[in-house]
């Protein structure tokens, strides 16, 4: 602010020398004259003009009137007249509003400046700055410091700039030689630019200074532009900002270089294929996304690379992105919504992991949740200023994307907690979550997904968070009533949402349905309450398998989000448990086995280049294969549980909520492993009962096999393997050279026809194995089986009554097996079951095969696998049975040799701590 009036003189203490009568006395009432003159009328009078002229003359003639006046130095400049009272305090004391004696101590400094060693200066034009201005200056200084730190620490960028400058100078002067110009040419940059953001100082980790190297780099001459501190996706989407984006020719992360055109292809692939599963970001180009957030950009590129025929790019980026996330989120606390969105994407399409504890997705979700709370995402954009003071240029849609990010964090928290069997840390809803139920601006699928996750949170809070029991579960006697109410509420929610059938939302709805059934199957629940949910669990699981089997026709399994893949995994584990249970209806057993085989082949039938990738898909396939080996080697582990009349469907685990199903099956694998170690070197006794194993083959790839999937009218998905022409020709050539049966990747060719159904065993058995009193084996068309429809609602209600009468029927079966069998055979229409015996002498009573395997006294052995008529004619039964047996013996050789280390699926389960019961 400029002053229109002259500055008041500041004089030292009065001296004995006579003063000029025209000079006003300093710091005395004489000072009031100019103040009073200011208050007078602005009309010019001769008297006023004469006073002003005298005052200006006296001011100009006074040597001590210059300003700013440093104490002890004569003033050297004049100032405009002000008319205010003279300034007697130094600038420091005026800024802090404290008493100052600078005028009294002149020419010495005031007491405070003298004590603090400051330069005491009196400046009438100085005006104290406001607090907000100081804060703004501090922000500017911090930003400058960050830029300086980046330039000083980043040697490569400075070297590149200097070399570029020298090269230009040399080319202009044309004085340097070829070798000198080559030295001056910028080298192929081994850029180690660390990840920088608008809210964290740059981090550069050199190889000789830190064990964690920086992995981020970008090839561009201009310095890196900082992200918008608003952190909202739409803040950079204005036309002005798009024009200001720095052009980027290629993107570099560690040793991975991605050209711009390739980055745009992967960016568009993600936006069209993957983003609809969880629409939480908006982006128009790869360059725009990179300028928003490097971590978000690379997370999108990593996810889109799942569609590549070769996993080279995906595997190269996986470890680098994990390191980048550590640099971004742990070394410095990010304040960016984009970082939260990147963590969500990395949790929905997880990084490669071999064991459960190796999966860092749950930690990413927890970090995203904590950052969201710190940034105020749970309170919406209306209160953003209460959580951050540096929000800049909020876009018109910033609140929308911030809200979607918070909704996605809530969904991921509920899903991953259920997957791991942990109570969710977000166990209550808020305004944004409740409003999302009716918010029509949200995409329908996303809104339905959030509504289902809210119900999922309620389900776990009611059934799995209790303070009256150490396992946290609801009292067993109260579970049936609560589950019945929750099941009806879920059905009302389905009617209200009206989601599309056969889509991802129905898959997640059925997954929650299975969670309700799992709570009913936990130990302690009365048996009569468990059997009510057996049919519901079977129908939900087979429906999930059918839907996903159709979805993979349009998108590969590995590209599906984790919440769909986990639904399939949970379904196959549920079916595996149910098909060994005494409570599953007989006619559902074959269908359950075929669905299990379908899922295993779906998980294993991938491209050969991707077969070594370790993730949740490969882990599920390994668990199924190990469970199948338990069926083959130690069937008593399952039989003992099934024969116990009081045992639950889930027999042991209960403290992992709905994940207890997975841990219960893993216990069976570890128990079989423990027994194999104890039986090493001993002659293994043949079990009295042997369960027909499932036709699992882990050597199947899309290069050698094609899968043909069909769905019967009753909802059963059946998958058969068909070898490719190339694989068939190679198998024939090997078989001709070695005079061995046809095999493809070690799999006998006749075994490819097996789909998991036990009826195939009946069709392949020779007539000599049938007992004399049994009817002859007849062939029945498959159309009769396909005419079975899904059980109606009345049949599901009758199922509980059938299960309650089951024990009485079993007792009568044991007392009069022959009469019971004849009665069942006569009452049935054209028979779908048949009686066979393990040995010709009929040492065991007859049984009903296939549709109710475990309650019987005999199960088919491995040598009764499916055989085509051609194989029967060419080969005898014994060589073929030996071939099948050798196949499974080779797969289980690790159990007996104690060299199989692939059964530690959890990463922490110690089998030596589990005592045999």
Curated annotation (Swiss-Prot):
<dbReference type="GO" id="GO:0006355">
    <property type="term" value="P:regulation of DNA-templated transcription"/>
</dbReference>
<feature type="DNA-binding region" description="Zn(2)-C6 fungal-type">
    <location>
        <begin position="90"/>
        <end position="120"/>
    </location>
</feature>
<keyword id="KW-0408">Iron</keyword>
<dbReference type="GO" id="GO:0030447">
    <property type="term" value="P:filamentous growth"/>
</dbReference>
<keyword id="KW-0539">Nucleus</keyword>
<dbReference type="GO" id="GO:1901966">
    <property type="term" value="P:regulation of cellular response to iron ion starvation"/>
</dbReference>
<keyword id="KW-0963">Cytoplasm</keyword>
<dbReference type="GO" id="GO:0071469">
    <property type="term" value="P:cellular response to alkaline pH"/>
</dbReference>
<dbReference type="GO" id="GO:1900445">
    <property type="term" value="P:positive regulation of filamentous growth of a population of unicellular organisms in response to biotic stimulus"/>
</dbReference>
<keyword id="KW-0597">Phosphoprotein</keyword>
<dbReference type="GO" id="GO:0001216">
    <property type="term" value="F:DNA-binding transcription activator activity"/>
</dbReference>
<feature type="region of interest" description="Disordered">
    <location>
        <begin position="1"/>
        <end position="88"/>
    </location>
</feature>
<dbReference type="GO" id="GO:0008270">
    <property type="term" value="F:zinc ion binding"/>
</dbReference>
<feature type="compositionally biased region" description="Polar residues">
    <location>
        <begin position="191"/>
        <end position="212"/>
    </location>
</feature>
<feature type="compositionally biased region" description="Pro residues">
    <location>
        <begin position="13"/>
        <end position="27"/>
    </location>
</feature>
<keyword id="KW-0805">Transcription regulation</keyword>
<feature type="region of interest" description="Disordered">
    <location>
        <begin position="168"/>
        <end position="212"/>
    </location>
</feature>
<dbReference type="GO" id="GO:0005634">
    <property type="term" value="C:nucleus"/>
</dbReference>
<dbReference type="GO" id="GO:0000976">
    <property type="term" value="F:transcription cis-regulatory region binding"/>
</dbReference>
<keyword id="KW-0175">Coiled coil</keyword>
<dbReference type="Pfam" id="PF04082">
    <property type="entry name" value="Fungal_trans"/>
</dbReference>
<keyword id="KW-0804">Transcription</keyword>
<dbReference type="GO" id="GO:0006879">
    <property type="term" value="P:intracellular iron ion homeostasis"/>
</dbReference>
<dbReference type="Pfam" id="PF00172">
    <property type="entry name" value="Zn_clus"/>
</dbReference>
<feature type="compositionally biased region" description="Low complexity">
    <location>
        <begin position="56"/>
        <end position="70"/>
    </location>
</feature>
<keyword id="KW-0238">DNA-binding</keyword>
<comment type="subunit">
    <text>Interacts with SSN3 and SFU1.</text>
</comment>
<dbReference type="InterPro" id="IPR051089">
    <property type="entry name" value="prtT"/>
</dbReference>
<comment type="function">
    <text>Transcription factor which plays an essential role in virulence by activating the transcription of iron uptake genes such as FRE7 in iron-poor environments such as the host bloodstream and internal organs. Promotes commensalism in a mouse model of gastrointestinal infection.</text>
</comment>
<dbReference type="GO" id="GO:0000981">
    <property type="term" value="F:DNA-binding transcription factor activity, RNA polymerase II-specific"/>
</dbReference>
<dbReference type="InterPro" id="IPR001138">
    <property type="entry name" value="Zn2Cys6_DnaBD"/>
</dbReference>
<feature type="region of interest" description="Disordered">
    <location>
        <begin position="778"/>
        <end position="849"/>
    </location>
</feature>
<keyword id="KW-0843">Virulence</keyword>
<feature type="compositionally biased region" description="Polar residues">
    <location>
        <begin position="71"/>
        <end position="81"/>
    </location>
</feature>
<keyword id="KW-0479">Metal-binding</keyword>
<dbReference type="GO" id="GO:0051701">
    <property type="term" value="P:biological process involved in interaction with host"/>
</dbReference>
<dbReference type="InterPro" id="IPR036864">
    <property type="entry name" value="Zn2-C6_fun-type_DNA-bd_sf"/>
</dbReference>
<keyword id="KW-0862">Zinc</keyword>
<feature type="compositionally biased region" description="Low complexity">
    <location>
        <begin position="171"/>
        <end position="184"/>
    </location>
</feature>
<dbReference type="GO" id="GO:0006281">
    <property type="term" value="P:DNA repair"/>
</dbReference>
<dbReference type="GO" id="GO:0005737">
    <property type="term" value="C:cytoplasm"/>
</dbReference>
<feature type="coiled-coil region">
    <location>
        <begin position="129"/>
        <end position="164"/>
    </location>
</feature>
């Amino acid at each position: 602010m400029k002053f229109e009036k002259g500055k008041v003189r500041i004089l030292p203490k009065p001296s004995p020398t006579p003063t000029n009568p025209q000079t006003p006395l300093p710091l005395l009432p004489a000072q009031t004259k100019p103040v009073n003159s200011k208050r007078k009328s602005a009309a010019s009078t001769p008297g006023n003009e004469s006073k002003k002229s005298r005052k200006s003359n006296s001011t100009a003639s006074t040597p001590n009137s210059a300003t700013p006046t440093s104490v002890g130095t004569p003033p050297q400049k004049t100032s405009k007249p002000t008319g205010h009272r003279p300034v007697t305090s130094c600038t420091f004391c005026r800024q802090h509003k404290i008493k100052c004696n600078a005028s009294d101590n002149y020419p010495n400094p005031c007491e405070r400046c003298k004590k603090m060693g400051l330069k005491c200066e009196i400046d009438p034009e100085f005006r104290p700055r406001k607090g907000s201005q100081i804060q703004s200056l501090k922000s500017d200084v911090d930003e400058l410091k960050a830029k300086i730190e980046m330039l000083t620490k980043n040697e490569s960028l400075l070297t590149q700039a200097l070399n570029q400058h020298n090269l230009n100078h040399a080319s202009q002067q044309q004085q340097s030689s070829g070798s000198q110009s080559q030295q001056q040419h910028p080298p192929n940059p081994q850029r180690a630019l660390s990840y920088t953001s608008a809210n964290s100082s740059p981090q550069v980790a050199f190889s000789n200074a830190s064990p964690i190297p920086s992995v981020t780099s970008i090839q561009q001459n201009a310095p890196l532009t900082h992200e918008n501190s608003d952190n909202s996706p739409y803040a950079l989407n204005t036309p002005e900002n798009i024009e200001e984006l720095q052009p980027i020719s290629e993107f570099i992360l560690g040793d991975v270089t991605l050209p711009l055109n390739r980055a745009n292809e992967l960016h568009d692939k993600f936006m069209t294929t993957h983003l609809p599963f969880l629409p939480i970001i908006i982006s128009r180009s790869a360059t725009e996304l990179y300028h928003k957030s490097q971590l978000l950009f690379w997370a999108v590129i990593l996810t889109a690379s799942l569609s590549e025929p070769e996993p080279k790019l995906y595997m190269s980026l996986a470890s680098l992105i994990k390191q980048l996330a550590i640099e971004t989120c742990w070394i410095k606390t990010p304040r960016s919504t984009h970082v939260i969105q990147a963590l969500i994407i990395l949790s929905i399409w997880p990084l490669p992991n071999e064991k459960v504890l190796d999966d860092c997705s749950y930690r990413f979700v927890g970090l995203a949740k904590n950052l969201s709370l710190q940034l105020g995402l749970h309170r919406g954009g209306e209160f953003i200023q209460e959580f951050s003071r540096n929000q800049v240029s909020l876009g018109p849609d910033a609140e929308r994307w911030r809200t979607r990010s918070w909704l996605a964090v809530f969904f991921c928290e509920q899903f991953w907690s259920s997957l791991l069997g942990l109570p969710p840390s977000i166990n209550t809803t808020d305004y944004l979550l409740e409003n999302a139920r009716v918010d029509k601006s949200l995409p329908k699928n996303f809104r339905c997904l959030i509504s289902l996750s809210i119900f999922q949170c309620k389900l776990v809070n009611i059934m799995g968070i209790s303070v009256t029991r150490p396992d946290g579960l609801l009292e067993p006697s109260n579970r049936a009533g609560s589950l019945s109410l929750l099941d009806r509420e879920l059905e009302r929610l389905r009617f209200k949402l009206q989601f599309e059938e056969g889509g991802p939302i129905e898959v997640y709805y059925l997954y929650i349905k299975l969670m309700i059934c799992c709570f009913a199957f936990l130990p302690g629940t009365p048996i009569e309450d468990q059997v009510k949910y057996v049919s519901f669990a079977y129908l939900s699981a087979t429906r999930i398998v059918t839907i996903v089997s159709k979805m993979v026709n349009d998108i590969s399994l590995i590209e599906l989000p984790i919440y769909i893949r986990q639904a399939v995994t949970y379904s196959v584990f549920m079916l595996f448990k149910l098909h060994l249970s005494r409570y599953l209806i007989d006619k559902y057993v074959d269908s359950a086995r075929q669905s299990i085989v379908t899922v295993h082949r779906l998980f294993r039938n991938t491209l050969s280049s991707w077969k070594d990738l370790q993730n949740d898909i490969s882990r599920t396939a390994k668990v199924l294969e190990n469970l199948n080996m338990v069926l083959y080697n130690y069937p008593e582990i399952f039989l003992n549980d099934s024969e116990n009349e009081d045992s639950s469907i889930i027999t042991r685990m209960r403290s992992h909520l709905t994940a207890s199903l997975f841990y219960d099956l893993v216990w069976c694998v570890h128990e079989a492993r423990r027994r194999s170690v104890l039986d090493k070197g001993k002659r293994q006794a043949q079990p009295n009962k042997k369960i027909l194993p499932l036709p699992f083959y882990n050597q199947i790839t899309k290069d050698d096999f094609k899968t043909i999937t069909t769905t019967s009218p009753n909802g059963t998905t059946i998958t058969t393997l068909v070898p490719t022409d190339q694989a068939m020709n190679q198998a024939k050539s090997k078989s001709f050279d070695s005079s061995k049966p046809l095999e493809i990747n070690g799999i006998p060719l006749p075994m490819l026809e097996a789909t998991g159904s036990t009826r195939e065993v009946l069709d392949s058995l020779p007539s000599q194995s049938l007992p004399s009193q049994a009817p002859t084996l007849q062939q029945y068309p498959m159309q009769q089986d396909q005419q079975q429809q899904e059980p109606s609602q009345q049949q599901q209600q009758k199922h509980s009554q059938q299960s309650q009468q089951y024990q009485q029927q079993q007792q009568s079966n044991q007392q009069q097996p022959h009469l019971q069998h004849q009665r069942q055979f006569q009452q049935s229409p054209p028979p779908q079951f048949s009686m066979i015996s393990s040995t010709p002498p009929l040492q065991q009573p007859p049984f009903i095969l296939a549709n109710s395997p475990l309650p019987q006294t005999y199960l088919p052995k491995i040598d009764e696998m499916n055989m085509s008529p051609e194989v029967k004619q060419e080969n005898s039964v014994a060589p073929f049975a030996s071939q099948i047996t050798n196949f499974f013996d080779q797969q289980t050789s690790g159990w007996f040799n104690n060299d199989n280390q692939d059964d530690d699926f959890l990463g922490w389960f110690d089998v030596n701590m589990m005592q045999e019961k």
